Amino acid sequence: AVLNKIAAIIDENKEHLAMVESMDNGKPIRETLAVDIPMAADHFRYFAGCIQAEEGSANILGKDTLSLILREPIGVVGQIVPWNFPFLMAAWKLAPVLASGCCTVFKTSSTTPLSVLEFARLVQDVIPAGVFNVITGSGSKSGQYMLDHPGFRKLAFTGSTEVGRNVALAAAQKLIPATLEL
């Protein structure tokens, strides 16, 4: 229900969110209104559907392939994203975290925090306190703080190879998984 409510909030505020996203990163309003904002809402709806799957079910997909569905929340996920798709990237990262029953600390790009901060404001009454946390600031300070913090059970990063290497090393030192889009 929460993910569908988030999608509805995005739909209800699509013009406003598209304007904020365009002001935030300079992308043409025609793109944010026609692509970024609707795709974000669709992404929350998609994951709302995913969590309807039967927990613990098993399917034989082929001679040597068995598919198992288990729900095992991993814990707090630290996520760091780049400047170019701030709102859509937030949807891509947040929807699966919520669907899996986890919490996140979401670090925006220091140059494009506005649309994610506005999104967080709009959904604050739908998402329980402490589940979706947004931090801003320079990557060398707030991003590094996340990499050094012992409370994360997974790290996710989208951006440069150089920083991605640092994220991978931080995850390896903690023996936690990392998702890297470089």
Residue ranges and their predicted role:
Residues 1-54, 64:
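Glycine-rich loop-to-alpha-helix module at the N-terminal edge of alpha/beta enzyme cores
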Residues 55-182:
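Rossmann-like NAD(P) dinucleotide-binding subdomain of oxidoreductase/dehydrogenase enzymes
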